[in-house]
């Protein structure tokens, strides 16, 4: 016997996608997340397409996943989607050593991040 389905935490007009283990610091990822917050999904995709930030490719992939979730899983209209939330969380931090002069060593931190994108369908203004 299977477990009962969990209640959906989002409203019916929203869909989300999560990208984990992104190899970038949360501070740098938040710069790209700020660009797309509150924008139409199509405009946000265009911004990410021409962004010069390295992580914009992964953010675009996560946004496309959120749009696909909205379309296929929740039957939302793609043309009416807006990025309602895009927030960044800290992931793990890998610690490595770098050789320094005179037999010493220095620590190198390699941070990871998590990205959550929530898209919402807004009513088309007539």
Curated annotation (Swiss-Prot):
GO molecular function, one term: rRNA binding
Cysteine-cysteine disulfides: none
GO cellular component, one term: cytosolic large ribosomal subunit
Keywords: Ribonucleoprotein, Ribosomal protein, RNA-binding, rRNA-binding
Presence of the UniProt keyword Ribonucleoprotein in the record: yes
Keyword RNA-binding: yes
Gene3D superfamilies assigned to the protein according to its UniProt record, in alphabetical order: Ribosomal protein L22/L17 (3.90.470.10)
InterPro entries to which the protein is assigned, alphabetical: Ribosomal_uL22 (IPR001063), Ribosomal_uL22_bac/chlpt-type (IPR005727), Ribosomal_uL22_bac/org-type (IPR047867), Ribosomal_uL22_sf (IPR036394)
One of the protein's GO biological processes: translation
Functional summary from the UniProt entry: This protein binds specifically to 23S rRNA; its binding is stimulated by other ribosomal proteins, e.g. L4, L17, and L20. It is important during the early stages of 50S assembly. It makes multiple contacts with different domains of the 23S rRNA in the assembled 50S subunit and ribosome. The globular domain of the protein is located near the polypeptide exit tunnel on the outside of the subunit, while an extended beta-hairpin is found that lines the wall of the exit tunnel in the center of the 70S ribosome.
Subunit structure: Part of the 50S ribosomal subunit.
Sequence similarity: Belongs to the universal ribosomal protein uL22 family.
PANTHER family (UniProt xref): CHLOROPLAST 50S RIBOSOMAL PROTEIN L22-RELATED, LARGE RIBOSOMAL SUBUNIT PROTEIN UL22M
Protein's UniProt name: Large ribosomal subunit protein uL22
Taxonomic source organism: Bradyrhizobium sp. (strain ORS 278)
